[in-house]
Amino acid sequence: MQQNLRILLSAVFFVYFLGLKTQHLEAEEIFQKGEHCLAYKTEETILLFIDSDVVGKTCEISARLESEGENTRYVVSFPIRSLDSGVDMRDKDVIEILSAESDPIIRFVSDFVTGEQVVEALVQGTTTLSGVLEVGGNSYKMLFPLKLSEHSGVWLVTGKLVTSFSDFGLELPAVLGGVVANTRDYLELLVHIRLDRVHGLAEFQAESISQ
């Protein structure tokens, strides 16, 4: 009994101090310059009164371009187990909620876009990309608002989609069953992708130029 109490108190203090350090994170603080990563952000209340941001991030992503004639689409995926929030208990809960045992990969497949749409996005610096997000064996139609910018010769795609756990039919993650932290039904999906890391893009550009 005393050992269980010590474990509980240790977890409480750990998450308490973690919450003090992770309040109100913006996307610029989540991703480092030059990273090729994805993340989620949600909000939780720690010990009933401390509001804190929770961020789970992965840089183990696969991004590739698929072409059909002059049209292209983009496929981005990552293993659920690669999401890291800095708290093992929370990450294990997320793995269970997202059914990682049976469907270990989350994948987004965009709709096909034309070359004119790509050029327009690069010129304007903003676009919306529609497609399907595959999570836990289910598919969800999504519309991602994105920004495109060039940094030191590298094009970067960033974006934030505001949604909720209930939109995906998911339970809310909780630390120690909600004793330590309760998560709100709020979810941000964050994108920070380097176009030079998108497989097949350079080959498609070279082929287009040669034609």
Each predicted region: which residue ranges?
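Bacterial N-terminal signal peptides
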Residues: 9-21
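Generic alpha-helix initiation/capping and coil-helix boundary signal
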Residues: 3-4, 15, 56
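Low-complexity, acidic/polar, glycine-enriched regions of mature
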Residues: 23-211
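Bacterial N-terminal signal peptides that target proteins for export
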Residues: 1-9
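Intrinsic disorder/low-complexity segments enriched in polar/small residues
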Residues: 3-4, 22-24
